């Protein structure tokens, strides 16, 4: 089992999905000086407790890559203080839970994926496009690595704002995982989203196939019903759903 906890995002930080970017916000790697602030934000916005080992790994770059959002327009003593962050880790493609969904050469053991662990923005800086920019930093970084085949993450099933954001960023929803999260003794489903890069995209994921079949059958039923209701109609209109992402 991974020594890092299952990944969470802050639901409310996803409210900025369609907002214009703020020019005073800059993005940089997280460093040891961010430790206290990083711990504080995680405590404030996430429903689970993260161990000290996790934060030490983040700020020291041990098995984790990370980005901080800072507001350079703030007074000097706060201009480099975290207002948002994203943390992620490398996972070997052959050892990942999506190895059946990506194209990669199994003989090349160095081929990897990037898994997003945590993402959050402090309340006073939401609705400014910061969450979107942080995810974009991860995608840009991953796309520049020839051995990387994708970026993936989990999102709790009721977090509609986050789901919309990932779709907008061209992530694909490939699976629904029942009871994935355990929060306050209650289980919650999660969706698995993947951003395919460097030619790793499979022709169609199992979930997309299932969604297509369901939509096809629904369309067929609707068309038959329409024909029976109007015998003068010439030909059936088969309605296909072009968007097979999870909803």
From Swiss-Prot:
One GO molecular-function entry: histone acetyltransferase activity
Enzyme class (EC, first level): transferase
Gene3D superfamilies membership: 3.40.630.30
Matching InterPro entries? Acyl_CoA_acyltransferase (IPR016181), GNAT_dom (IPR000182), NAA60-like (IPR045141)
Q: Name one Pfam family in it.
A: Acetyltransf_1
As its record notes, the protein acts as a catalyst of: L-lysyl-[protein] + acetyl-CoA = N(6)-acetyl-L-lysyl-[protein] + CoA + H(+)
* PROSITE patterns listed in its UniProt record: GNAT
Q: Which GO terms describe its biological process?
A: chromosome segregation; meiotic cell cycle
Q: Which UniProt keywords apply?
A: Acyltransferase, Chromatin regulator, Chromosome partition, Meiosis, Transferase
- N-acetyltransferase domain sequence ranges: 25-198
The EC number(s) this enzyme carries: 2.3.1.48
Cysteine-cysteine disulfides:
none
Superkingdom of origin: Eukaryota
Question: What is the recorded function of this protein according to its Swiss-Prot or TrEMBL entry?
Answer: Histone acetyltransferase that probably regulates acetylation status of histone H3 during meiosis. Histone acetylation may influence recombination and chromosome segregation.
Q: What else is known?
A: The gain-of-function mutant mcc1 (T-DNA tagging) has elongated rosette leaves, increased stem length elongation, early flowering and reduced fertility and seed number due to defects in meiosis.
Q: What protein is this chain from? A: Histone acetyltransferase MCC1
Organism per entry: Arabidopsis thaliana (Mouse-ear cress)
Gene designation per UniProt: MCC1
């Amino acid at each position: 089992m991974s020594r890092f906890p299952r990944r969470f995002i802050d639901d409310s930080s996803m409210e900025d999905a369609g907002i214009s970017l703020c020019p005073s916000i800059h993005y940089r790697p997280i460093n040891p000086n961010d430790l206290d602030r990083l711990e504080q934000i995680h405590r404030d916005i996430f429903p689970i407790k993260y161990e000290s080992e996790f934060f030490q790994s983040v700020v020291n770059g041990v098995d984790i890559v990370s980005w901080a959002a800072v507001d350079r327009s703030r007074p000097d003593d706060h201009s480099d203080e975290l207002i948002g962050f994203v943390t992620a880790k490398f996972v070997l493609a052959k050892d990942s839970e999506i190895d059946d969904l990506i194209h990669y050469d199994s003989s090349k053991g160095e081929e990897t994926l990037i898994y997003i662990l945590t993402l959050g923005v402090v309340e006073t800086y939401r609705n400014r496009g910061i969450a979107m920019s942080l995810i974009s930093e991860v995608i840009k970084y991953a796309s520049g690595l020839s051995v990387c085949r994708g970026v993936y993450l989990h999102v709790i099933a009721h977090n509609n704002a986050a789901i919309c954001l990932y779709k907008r960023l061209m992530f694909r929803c490939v699976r629904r995982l029942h009871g994935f999260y355990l929060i306050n003794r209650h289980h919650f489903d999660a969706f698995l989203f993947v951003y395919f890069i460097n030619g790793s995209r499979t022709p169609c994921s199992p979930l997309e196939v299932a969604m297509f079949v369901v939509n096809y059958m629904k369309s067929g039923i609707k068309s038959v019903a329409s024909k029976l209701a109007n015998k003068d109609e010439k030909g059936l209109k088969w309605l296909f759903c072009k968007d097979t992402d999870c909803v």
